[in-house]
Design a protein with these regions (language model features):
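Bacterial N-terminal signal peptides
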Residues: 8-18
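OB-fold/S1-family single-stranded nucleic acid-binding modules
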Residues: 94-114, 164-177
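Positively charged n-region of N-terminal signal peptides that target proteins for export
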Residues: 1-4
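Beta-strand/loop nucleic-acid-binding surfaces
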Residues: 66-80, 137-149
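Short nucleic-acid-contacting surface segments enriched for D/E, G, S/T with interspersed K/R
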Residues: 76-89, 146-160
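Structural detector for short beta-strands of small beta-barrel domains
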Residues: 37-54, 113-127, 161
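Bacterial signal peptide processing site
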Residues: 22-24
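Short, acidic/hydrophobic/Gly-rich beta-strand patch recurrent on exposed beta strands
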Residues: 58-64, 131-135, 172-174
Length: 177
């Protein structure tokens, strides 16, 4: 009986040491521990909307592979609008609506669409020109923007393609508001 108790103490100590080394990423089992649930994590992947109405979920398909991660919180609807885009999301691990791991998203940025690099931000008109203002305050003057893009001034949009040429694609993330 004493050997079994000592073995359990050693096993508990090893588990505790392993948990202390956690960098905030999702453990292989998919359920975050108490320490990682409070940690902010940044993930990259492709957004997808899965399921059938009225029970759809917005998920991140991680760039490195692995299980889908449900994206929840105030950014959910904006993320649904960029389904198919590659994004970088930041947030905290939490419980989702399904058995899959979930991330309560605090912020995100569109990084690529259809294999083309992309940037997102608020669209402004400045002296007759369209300017994209990124989350970090960078101001990017858009070269030969399509006329339809002007209708989105005041909203958050993504623009794909080289920034020194006409945008190859664009889309709405959040309407002006």
């Amino acid at each position: 009986m004493r050997a079994t108790g000592a073995l359990m103490i050693v096993a508990a100590a090893l588990l505790g040491a392993a948990a202390a080394c956690n960098s905030g990423s999702m453990p292989p089992g998919g359920a975050p521990g108490a320490a990682s649930a409070a940690a902010v994590d940044t993930l990259r992947g492709t957004v997808a909307v899965v399921g059938a109405a009225p029970v759809t979920r917005v998920v991140l398909r991680p760039a490195g592979g692995g299980a889908d991660i449900e994206l929840v919180g105030a950014q959910r609807d904006a993320l649904a609008r960029v389904a198919g885009a590659e994004v970088r999301v930041a947030g905290r691990h939490t419980r989702g609506t399904a058995s899959a791991p979930a991330l309560e998203v605090a912020s995100f940025a569109v990084t690529a669409v259809d294999g083309q690099p992309a940037v997102d931000g608020r669209l402004e008109r400045e002296g007759g020109q369209l300017v994209l203002v990124t989350a970090d305050g960078r101001r990017i003057r858009l070269v030969q923007p399509p006329a339809a893009l002007a209708d989105l001034v005041g909203g958050r949009v993504w623009v794909a393609g080289p920034l020194d040429r006409e945008p190859q694609a664009f889309g709405l993330i959040e309407p002006r508001g």
